[in-house]
Amino acid sequence: MKLVTVIIKPFKLEDVREALSSIGIQGLTVTEVKGFGRQKGHAELYRGAEYSVNFLPKVKIDVAIADDQLDEVIDIVSKAAYTGKIGDGKIFVAELQRVIRIRTGEADEAAL
């Protein structure tokens, strides 16, 4: 099993959610986060003064999947989140040792 973590621009959340749903992904966790990468941040003008905004708003999506879904998930998320502009985001993949559905006690892939 894998844990796929995706950091994207907030306005792409619904596109990514719909794309994941279209391939049968039924559950995900979404968190509003702030961060920066190569994009660094940007300057904003407020009441005539320029301010530096170092952390940009992003959305983090966590989804637990079976190993055989990994390539399809990466492909569909990459396409759905793409704008071609700096700051499109990142996809991180980690091994999942165990998953337990608390209500039923189901474990591992049965709990996904």
Curated annotation (Swiss-Prot):
Keywords: ATP-binding, Cell inner membrane, Cell membrane, Cytoplasm, Membrane, Nucleotide-binding, Phosphoprotein
Induction remark: Expression is regulated by the nitrogen status. May be regulated through the NRI/NRII two-component regulatory system.
Main location: cytoplasm
Entry-linked Pfam families: P-II
Residues the record lists as binding ATP: G37, A64, G87, D88, G89, K90, R101, I102, R103
Processing after translation: Uridylylated/deuridylylated by GlnD. Fully uridylylated in nitrogen-limited conditions and deuridylylated when extracellular ammonium increases. Uridylylation abrogates binding to AmtB.
GO molecular function term, any single one: enzyme regulator activity
Residue(s) carrying O-UMP-tyrosine: Y51
Positions bound to ADP: T29, R38, Q39, A64, G87, D88, G89, K90, R101, I102, R103
Top-level taxon of the source organism: Bacteria
Consequence of changing Y51F: Leads to complete inhibition of AmtB activity
Activity regulation text: Formation of the GlnK-AmtB complex is influenced by intracellular pools of the effector molecules ATP, ADP, Mg(2+) and 2-oxoglutarate. The rapid drop in the 2-oxoglutarate pool upon ammonium influx and a simultaneous, but transient, change in the ATP/ADP ratio promotes AmtB-GlnK complex formation. ADP orients the surface of GlnK for AmtB blockade. The GlnK-AmtB interaction is also controlled by the level of intracellular glutamine and the uridylylation status of GlnK.
Subcellular location: Cytoplasm; Cell inner membrane
Gene Ontology BP, a term: regulation of nitrogen utilization
Null allele phenotype: Mutant lacking this gene shows very high expression of the glnK and nac promoters in nitrogen-starved cells, and has a severe defect in the growth rate recovery in ammonia after nitrogen starvation.
GO cellular component, one term: cytosol
Assembly information from the UniProt record: Homotrimer. In response to elevation of the extracellular ammonium concentration, interacts and forms a complex with AmtB. Binds to the cytoplasmic face of AmtB with a stoichiometry of AmtB(3):GlnK(3). Sequestration by AmtB is reversible. In nitrogen-poor medium, can form heterotrimers with GlnB (PII protein).
Free-text comment on this protein's domains from its UniProt entry: Interacts with AmtB almost exclusively via a long surface loop containing Tyr-51 (T-loop), the tip of which inserts deeply into the cytoplasmic pore exit, blocking ammonia conduction. Uridylylation probably sterically blocks the T-loop region from interacting with AmtB.
Family, per entry: Belongs to the P(II) protein family.
Record function comment: Involved in the regulation of nitrogen metabolism. Regulates the activity of its targets by protein-protein interaction in response to the nitrogen status of the cell. Involved in the regulation of the ammonium transporter AmtB so as to optimize ammonium uptake under all growth conditions. In nitrogen-limited conditions, GlnK does not interact with AmtB, which remains active and imports ammonium. When extracellular ammonium increases, GlnK associates tightly with AmtB in the inner membrane, thereby inhibiting the transporter activity.
Protein name per its UniProtKB record: Nitrogen regulatory protein GlnK
Originating species: Escherichia coli (strain K12)
Taxonomic lineage: Bacteria, Pseudomonadati, Pseudomonadota, Gammaproteobacteria, Enterobacterales
Gene, per the UniProt record: glnK
